[in-house]
């Protein structure tokens, strides 16, 4: 029993030493997470596609972002689309910093910002990106929505995971639905589970309450892997049109089994 107790005790001590030597191995505290949340202030000058010789005029919006490492900030593409100036600010710091848009993917509504001044990142914790959250898993949405000046944290669960439309691009990608409140200004803010990023707040359903949508971690990781070589190539597309074989008469006309399903390639 004595030897066994010593082995168990030694294992506990080794585990403690590993955690102390590698703080990232432990989940970051709420305060550490808040240190990585960024308020994004963008000035836009959108083109007028009906009158292409002019623009719609300058307007300003605010969104959110998160520090992810390599002195980069991850946010939504629609927050910085057609920007003429992007500034960022951390809670508790009076200074604003000018940011550059390094990469942007309008189809999946993600963008990476960089800042030349390293002092912006002082004492900030770069958050890790996890995998696809499980259904019913609890998440927290961090950001700077309208209604106040400090960081807002709302909590909820992942209620649905499916392929659907991203409003910014009208393209269909994997997304997750959460019942945590997502309001204007939350766009680009991280969705956290167990101290890691599982998504980026993206859009909400206006006709309902507490139905928000996030860009899930697999889409984020695809985007980040794409730009590792210094250029953005985009998401591959299968250039075909399909129709669901739900109509009984259509299946019969194609001589398909009565209870079969599938897709019909139409173009």
Where do the model's predicted regions map?
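N-terminal secretory signal peptides that target proteins for export/translocation
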Residues: 1-5
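N-terminal activation segment of mature serine protease catalytic domains
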Residues: 24-76, 85, 134, 223-226, ...
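C-terminal cap/linker of serine protease catalytic domains
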Residues: 28-32, 40, 117, 121, ...
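Conserved active-site neighborhood of the chymotrypsin/trypsin-like protease fold
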Residues: 46, 69-151, 184, 208
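Soluble non-cytosolic domains of exported or imported proteins
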Residues: 62, 130-134, 148, 152, ...
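Conserved hydrophobic positions within beta-strands
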Residues: 65-67, 99-101, 158, 265
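Active-site region of chymotrypsin-like
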Residues: 36-42, 48-55, 116-126, 152-209, ...
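Bacterial N-terminal signal peptides
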Residues: 10-19
């Amino acid at each position: 029993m004595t030897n066994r107790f010593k082995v168990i005790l030694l294992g506990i001590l080794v585990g403690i030493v590993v955690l102390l030597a590698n703080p990232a191995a432990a989940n970051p505290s709420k305060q550490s997470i808040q240190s990585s949340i960024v308020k994004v202030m963008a000035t836009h000058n959108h083109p007028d596609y009906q009158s292409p010789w002019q623009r719609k005029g300058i307007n300003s919006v605010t969104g959110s972002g998160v520090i992810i490492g390599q002195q980069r900030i991850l946010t939504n593409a629609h927050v910085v689309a057609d920007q003429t100036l992007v500034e960022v600010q951390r809670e508790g710091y009076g200074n604003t910093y000018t940011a550059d848009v390094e990469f942007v993917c309008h189809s999946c509504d993600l963008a990476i910002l960089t800042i030349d001044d390293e002092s912006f990142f002082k004492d900030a914790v770069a958050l890790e990106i996890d995998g696809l959250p499980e259904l019913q898993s609890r998440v927290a949405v961090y950001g700077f929505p309208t209604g106040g000046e400090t960081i807002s944290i709302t909590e909820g669960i992942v209620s649905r995971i499916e392929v659907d439309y991203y409003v910014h691009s009208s393209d269909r990608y994997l997304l997750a639905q959460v019942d945590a409140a997502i309001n204007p200004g939350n766009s680009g803010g991280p969705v956290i589970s167990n101290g890691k990023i599982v998504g980026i707040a993206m859009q909400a359903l206006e006709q309902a309450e507490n139905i928000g949508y996030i860009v899930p971690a697999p889409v984020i990781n695809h985007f980040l892997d794409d730009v590792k070589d210094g250029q953005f190539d985009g998401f591959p597309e299968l250039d075909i049109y399909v129709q669901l074989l739900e109509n009984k008469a259509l299946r019969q006309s194609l001589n398909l089994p009565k209870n079969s399903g599938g897709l019909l390639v139409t173009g």
